[in-house]
């Protein structure tokens, strides 16, 4: 694909190339406010509707040769409980494809390489200068969830997660999060209530294809519900850092892709 960024991103709706523009400053202010509470901000239609189907097809082709892995994990929950004698594993089942498999002129890679997006995100997160990851595998990667797959309840090791929804699942695949529940008095009871569906503060978000989402998940317990029906849920995950040249460990690469290079 050789489209310009203006053909891919709806710059009329989101004029983020000009950070000084009043519309962009208003968008930044809104994003900062929503990331502060509840910790989640979306930009529906960030990718033009006429482009979404093509990028989803490209992603689906790459994921067909991707690496599927399933695991039960406790660390994301356990770390948040301190010394509480509490363990409740959650399941993660997902297929991943590395950015190094994307063509140089891929629209997916064009989005990630577009400096105004990086600058906009850094401004929103309050981290400037801000850099896209130098890791060609993990920095710009695809995740695919087929029927039966899911991303169980967990906390992120850091805030500032950036994702782009390329294709909604035919059923299930809803993003759910419980804002700011990490730690504190009675944490275990809160976690159990969230995971049992009894917590009144849980938020459900059903993103449409083309939506850019920003999320602070370090203190918010969150998950993607099991996929119930085709088509697959396909998401582009974008990584950034406050320092240039950031790369991920071989263990992380192996976990995602079953390979290190």
Where are the regions that the model predicts?
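Non-heme Fe(II)-dependent double-stranded beta-helix
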Residues: 2-26, 36, 45-116
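A structural signal for well-ordered alpha-helical scaffolds and beta->alpha junctions
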Residues: 28, 114-118, 159, 217
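Short beta-strand segments enriched in hydrophobic/aromatic residues
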Residues: 59, 166, 240-242
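A generic secondary-structure signal for well-formed alpha-helical elements
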Residues: 63-67, 125, 244
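Catalytic core of non-heme Fe(II) oxygenases with the double-stranded beta-helix
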Residues: 102-104, 109, 118-212
């Amino acid at each position: 694909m050789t489209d310009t960024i203006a053909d891919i991103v709806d710059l009329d709706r989101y004029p983020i190339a000009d950070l000084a523009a009043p519309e962009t400053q208003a968008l930044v202010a809104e994003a900062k406010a929503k990331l502060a509470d509840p910790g989640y901000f979306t930009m529906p239609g960030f990718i033009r509707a006429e482009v979404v189907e093509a990028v989803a097809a490209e992603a689906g082709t790459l994921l067909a040769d991707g690496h599927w892995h399933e695991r039960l994990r406790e660390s994301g929950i356990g770390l948040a409980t301190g010394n509480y004698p509490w363990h409740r594993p959650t399941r993660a089942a997902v297929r991943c494809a590395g950015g190094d498999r994307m063509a140089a002129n891929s629209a997916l890679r064009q989005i990630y390489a577009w400096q105004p997006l990086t600058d906009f995100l850094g401004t929103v997160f309050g981290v400037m200068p801000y850099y896209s990851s130098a890791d060609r595998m993990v920095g710009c990667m695809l995740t695919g969830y087929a029927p039966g797959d899911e991303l169980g309840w967990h906390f992120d090791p850091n805030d500032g997660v950036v994702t782009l929804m390329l294709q909604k699942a035919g059923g299930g695949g809803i993003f759910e999060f419980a804002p700011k529940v990490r730690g504190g008095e009675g944490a275990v009871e809160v976690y159990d209530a969230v995971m049992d569906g009894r917590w009144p503060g849980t938020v459900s978000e059903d993103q449409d294809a083309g939506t850019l989402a920003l999320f602070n998940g370090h203190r918010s317990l969150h998950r993607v519900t099991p996929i119930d029906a085709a088509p697959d849920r396909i998401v582009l995950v974008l990584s950034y850092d406050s320092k240039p040249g950031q790369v991920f460990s071989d263990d992380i690469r192996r976990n995602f892709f079953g390979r290190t290079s």
